[in-house]
A protein has these predicted regions:
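… and, occasionally, acidic/histidine-rich disordered N-termini of signaling adaptors
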Residues: 130-304, 351-371
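Short amphipathic alpha-helix used as the core "switch/output" element in two-component signaling
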Residues: 65-76, 94
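Acidic catalytic/metal-coordinating carboxylates
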Residues: 36-37, 63-66, 87
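Active-site beta3 strand of CheY-like receiver
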Residues: 48-54, 59
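C-terminal output helix
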Residues: 88-90, 108-117
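Two-component/phosphorelay signaling modules centered on CheY-like receiver
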Residues: 2-6, 14-33
Length: 371
């Protein structure tokens, strides 16, 4: 291992021991930073780099165990080697359960400390490599997921579609699809319960099932029944999905299937906003559920907006929800998807999204895209 790329932090209020450890570590090539107290260490705001922490248990003010708790709370991942003059079992157990790598009792042999530090630095190096690999895999999965949602299929001349999806983690359980089937345009949006990788796996599978069903001209209720049966009979940890599939023909006649999802918004060219409110059970929630489609009509200049609950349940710092009424008001003003998404972010006062956030719009015979 390259000692120049690593640093050993030492926190001990005993100046003689602190100095002795500092001299020992420097004599064998380690970079060292010493601190008198736990608070001094926190105030230094240690850099995110390969390191380990040699920490006295009994410190004035914040104890060593208190500092360990603060590091965990602030998601600062530094391997900890505790040193103490009184190694009682409860303290040792608490420290090790919280992730300490070693617990040395004073007086300890120099080689024991050096070996513990070598082990801690190697542990940190390995952990960082694994974290980088994991992040790279998630980034690749995110690119694939976004690619699956890209509106790249040839769209018919009577409609224009645009979608936007932002997961609250690297990948998420929302998706949208737009494709041409025969002379019709089909738009779908779905939200799998939960977040992260597990939801993303189910979302990708569901998206593929819907896509295949549509291209095979399977009726919308049968697509939902097939998906519901597939997910209901498997042990998926209580996962289910809400979704909407909308099919629009060149003359504006349409049909839709809603499975427990937020009712779509229809912004009429006149300025009125209506909702497609007929609904069914979510897929994967109850085996043998029945599904029915409903009809509607779009006129020239009408716009269809579909969203997931990451939009309507976005929360302000005061604990208020963005809500369907607020969204309906913005839709009535003709706001674009980007403007609506920006409004959601502003409503949350710039805080990270708490849920996956997806919007899908479909313009029927517009003079140009309004997204």
């Amino acid at each position: 291992m390259n000692q120049e790329d690593s640093v050993v932090y030492v926190v001990d209020d005993d100046p003689s021991l602190r100095g002795a450890i500092d001299s020992l570590l420097r004599s064998v090539g380690w970079r060292v930073q010493t601190f008198v107290s736990a608070q001094d260490f926190l105030d230094s705001k240690p850099q995110d780099r390969q390191a380990c922490l040699v920490l006295d248990v009994a410190l004035p003010g914040l104890s060593g165990l208190d500092l360990q708790s603060e590091l965990i709370k602030n998601k600062i991942q530094i391997p900890v080697i505790f040193i103490t003059g009184h190694a009682d079992v409860p303290t040792s157990v608490r420290a090790m359960k919280a992730g300490a790598l070693e617990f040395l009792t004073k007086p300890f042999e120099e080689e024991d400390l050096l070996e513990a530090i070598r082990h801690a630095i190697e542990h940190d190096r390995t952990s960082r490599e694994q974290h980088r690999d994991h992040q790279e895999e998630l980034a690749a999965a995110a690119r694939i997921q976004q690619g699956l949602m890209a509106v790249t299929a040839l769209q018919p001349p009577f409609a224009e579609a645009l979608g936007k999806s932002q997961p609250c983690r690297e990948i998420g359980g929302d998706f949208f699809s737009v494709l041409t089937v025969g002379d019709s345009v089909v738009a779908a949006i779905a939200d799998v319960s939960g977040k992260g990788v597990a939801a993303a796996v189910m979302a990708s599978l569901l998206q593929g099932m819907i896509h295949e069903g549509l291209l095979s001209n399977v009726p919308l209720p049968e697509i939902a029944r097939n998906a519901n049966e597939f997910f209901s009979v498997r042990d998926l940890g209580s996962k289910y999905a809400t979704l909407v599939i909308v099919c629009v023909k060149p003359d504006g006649q349409g049909e839709y299937l809603n499975c427990g999802h937020i009712p779509p918004f229809v912004a009429r060219a006149s300025g009125e906003v209506t909702r497609l409110r007929e609904s069914n059970l979510p897929v994967g929630l109850m085996r043998n559920a029945e599904y029915r489609r409903s009809g509607f009509r779009l006129n020239c200049g009408d716009r269809l907006i579909l969203v997931t609950d990451g939009v309507t349940e976005a929360e302000s710092p005061e604990g208020d929800f963005f809500g369907e009424e607020r969204l309906e008001a913005f839709v009535s003003l003709g706001m674009s998807l980007d403007q609506i998404f920006t409004s959601v972010c502003l409503f949350q006062d710039g805080r990270p999204l708490s849920d996956d956030c997806t919007l899908l719009g479909l313009d029927y015979v517009g003079t140009g895209a309004r997204f």
